[in-house]
Structure formats: structure tokens, C-alpha cells
Amino acid sequence: MNERLRRTLTARYQAEIEDAKYKIKCYSEQEVIIPEHPDITGEVDKLLEKLSQAEEKMAVMELHYGKIVVKSVL
């Protein structure tokens, strides 16, 4: 797997992780029920599933294709 593809996939998975974490935080801090999402526990469960899938994909990619080396630009 080439470096650019790995970086792109890593960015994608990190974005999915951050998105899920942010939404879970919003649900946990706001005690207002959103009409479109009355099943808060179900929604958080779905978000946790997305979070775990993205983390697992990153772990599998690192296991089989190595870690991403971030190059700093000065």
C-alpha cells in the first residue's frame, strides 16, 4: 500500500472517530431530546459502533501495512 493511500485512509478513519466522539459528547452534555432522535441510547450505541470500526480499521492497516510516518515541513 502506498504512503498517500495510507495517509488518506488514516485521515478518513480519524475523521470518523472524531465525528463520533463529538456527537457522543453532544448527546451526553445536552439533556434535551431531539425529535428526530428520541432513542438516545440507540444513537450512542450506533456511534460507538462507528468509532470501534474506524479504530479497528486503523489497527488492521497498521498491523499489515505499517505505521504512518508523519513528515514535518519546516
Describe every region a protein language model picked out.
Residues 1-74:
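Extended, charge-rich alpha-helical interface modules
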